[in-house]
Amino acid sequence: MAEFQWPWEYTFPPFFTLQPHEETRQQQLKVWTDLFLKYLRHTNRFTLSIGDQNSPLFHNEALKRRLSPELVLAILGELERSGHANPLDKRRQEWQVYWFTLEEYGNMVYDWVQETGQTNTICTLYEIASGENTSHLDFYGVDEAVLLSALRLLEEKGRCELIEMDGSHGVKFF
């Protein structure tokens, strides 16, 4: 895996402090949300813990700067508003983060199903997320919990039906 390319802002000490000026803060949060999504995709991660203060995402060792939990929550709040994250606990300490929104994941999967003629067939979540037929697609490698959430949205729209057997999930597309 290639080394992650940090944006120039990552080497700018004030970037690690929540900015008081509204316009500056909004720009700062936009850069941070983009950085979170790119970094998590690069590292193939879908969950974040606010307590993970040693992650390079939260801590620039060279600058000796670290994101405050307040700033991390502000960033995750922005990701939540844009449909790219959801808290996994009531204390909002553990988060599931999506490289694409759940709706985008659902649409990508449904487009693939239609393009490959798999309507009215049953697929396993493994086939969709990790199968050789999807290795070239943006949703390849998606976390099963994220995929399941995206498929639930498709199910609400009547495009599929989730099937659970012995703790495993399958899905039939319409």
From Swiss-Prot:
The gene is Vps25. This is Vacuolar protein-sorting-associated protein 25. Disruption phenotype: Vps25 mutant cells exhibit multivesicular body sorting defects, with large amounts of ubiquitinated proteins detected on endosomes. This leads to activation of signals (through Notch and Dpp receptors) that drive cell proliferation, non-autonomous overgrowth, loss of epithelial organization, and render cells sensitive to apoptosis. Vps25 mutant cells display accumulation of autophagosomes. Bicoid mRNA is mislocalized in developing eggs. Component of the endosomal sorting complex required for transport II (ESCRT-II). Interacts with Lsn/Snf8/Vps22. It is found in: Cytoplasm; Endosome membrane. The lineage of its organism: Eukaryota, Metazoa, Ecdysozoa, Arthropoda, Hexapoda. GO terms for biological process: autophagosome maturation; bicoid mRNA localization; endosomal transport; endosome transport via multivesicular body sorting pathway; epithelial structure maintenance; imaginal disc-derived male genitalia morphogenesis; maintenance of epithelial cell apical/basal polarity; negative regulation of epithelial cell proliferation. It comes from Drosophila melanogaster. Pfam families: ESCRT-II (PF05871). One of its GO terms (cellular component) is ESCRT II complex.
